[in-house]
């Protein structure tokens, strides 16, 4: 695995992302060309994200994930997509982006828009890296009760944990993730770097 990784990608504009790869991974078009260089160095979280990216080749086989949390509008989704692009740029790695609110029985069985035609469930459970974006929003739709969707989200997180596959999660608060299922807090604290995204300043 390590032989496929390129240390010079962070991302570098000399290697622009392949559009078809972005489409096949369901990455939002808005995030196709975002760069860590656009984040001001004064942002404390930036170095932790850089460190995670630089050590992906070492932690991938251990299933080391990343949980990005913070207020809405701080760029968590963009950061997650930048990291996901690293997995795709550094080797022939299958990757996938999914909104947490779209993870339900019907959504999981739709065909993805890739030549292979993998069902979403296969992508979520088998891709080397997966982003689950805005985790916790499905709880807000039904007040304090956990919705049916959350059960599927929990299955994805636990399944990837058991198979030691890295997952990148964005949320407004870690507590929203912990509340989805019994024991998830222990999983997150064991296998994820937890990074608060705040005070972001996107240049350019």
Protein language model features and the residues they cover:
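A short, basic N-terminal segment
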Residues: 1-52, 194-204
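P-loop NTPase Walker A phosphate-binding motif
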Residues: 78-91
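Walker A/P-loop nucleotide-binding motif
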Residues: 62-80
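Walker B catalytic acidic pair
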Residues: 133-135
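Phosphate-binding P-loop
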Residues: 55-63
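Short glycine-rich substrate-engagement loop in P-loop NTPases that contacts/grips substrate
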Residues: 46, 50, 88-127
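Residue-level preference for the first positions of well-ordered beta-strands
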Residues: 63-67, 94, 129, 166-168
